[in-house]
Each structure stands twice: as structure tokens, then as C-alpha cells.
Amino acid sequence: MQSLALAAASLLSPFFLEVTPEVRSSYVSSGKLMEDRPMQITNVRAGYDAGDFGRFGVRNWDVSSLTDRRHDAHRHAFYHFEFGPTWEYDLKLAEEWTLKSDITRSWTLYRGFENDASNRTYSWYQIDQALANPYIVPFYRVRKCFRGNDYVYFKAGVRRRFGIWESLYVTPSVYAESGSSRNYRRVIGARTDGERWSDGVSSVSFRLELGWKFSENFSAFAFVEQYEVVGQAACHAISASSYRCAHNDWTLGGIGCRLKF
């Protein structure tokens, strides 16, 4: 398998293809617990490596339900798509210190919903940056959404990879998710006291990932994650909510692999 992957990578160069399929016990999307049942997610990227000018490509992210819990609301397979152009750039700051940037303009599509209002499309801009170094890696994400989902989402945290044995490694990370008042309402719901949410942190998550790098082209991973809603008012609002996945704290996990050509 390794020889086949290397052959495919050499044939594609300077073009690239990355595929990451995974199964998760639950699905958290931009700080909101969207589904507390198993989901299948696939992330695909393809493009051209322009060397010093970065990597130009396109991305596609799709979500499928692995249960029939919401069969009356939407179809099971591929009911949520995200796609758009991407640009990745690595800026070397010093020996072993690199600022990694990932910028995208994407569209989110929902399909197969019985409710016509849910069969909608909206667009967004997003930037991800991480300061890769041998110690602790800080990272953040900013997303600005448009067309009916007008909100700003922000995520920031730190992670650290520890080698265990040869190609086996573990990566603990912690991050907070926040955004504008519109994003807060999207995540938490309406306040129980009738007041308007202000901008702020809505949740904090702790993640532990175990990975095995079989080759430069193939790796597998498993993770466990603890999701926690922050703030007394937010917890009260979620406790009073009729939303099917209204949980103030939730433990989830998943398995997957990463293929790079």
C-alpha cells in the first residue's frame, strides 16, 4: 500500500490530493452541538503546489447521518456540503518556527430537508493560522458568514504533539469558541430572561488524539473530546431549550484516516 501511495504521489506532483474520512459519535459544528448521534464526515482537498507562492486548491466537506433519527427532517447521506477555493501558505520565521496560514471562501449547502427554509445556501470567509514550533502550537480560526447566517465565529487554542513510540503519537489540545452575539444565539439559543446575548466565549473543549503515521501518505487516528458550555446564563438557556441536542456538556469521540497524494 505504501508503494502504491508513493507512486500516486509522484504522478500527481506538483498537484496534490488529500482525503480525510472519519466517523464521529457526535458532531460539533463551529461551537454548536449539532447532532449527538453518530455521523460520517469526509474532507477532500485537491490543488496545485506553487512552491514559494503557496498551495492553491479547492475543498469539499460533506456530512452524512448514520442513524435514522431525523429521517423525517432530511435525507441520511450527504445532506450538508461545504465547498470552495483555498490558499495555504507557510511563512518560515526561524529554524523550526513556521506560521501556517489557510484561507478559504466557501459555500455551505443543505440538501434533502423536508422544510424548504432549511434547504438553503450561505457563504463565508475563513482564515486559519497556527504557529508551528517544537513546543506548544497556538492556533486560531476566524469565520465570517453571510446570506442569512450573518455572524462572526472565532476559535483559539493550543496543542502539543508527543511522540510515544516510532510513528505513534498523542496530541492533547484545548480551545475556546466564541463570536458575535448572533453566533452566540446560534450556539446557545434565546436567553431565558429575554435579554440580548453579548459577544463572548460560548464553549471550551478538551481533545486528546492518538495517531499512527504509517507513511508520508497515510496515517490513522482516534480521538476523544469533552465539550463544555461556558457561563451560567448560557447553561440555563440550554437547560430550558427543547432543541434535540441541548447539552451543557458532552463527551464525543471518533476514528479516521488521512490520505495524502
Residue ranges, per PLM feature:
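Outer-membrane beta-barrel transmembrane domain signature
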Residues: 43, 48-56, 94, 132, ...
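Short glycine/proline-enriched turns and hinge-like loops at secondary-structure junctions
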Residues: 34-37, 119, 150-152, 168
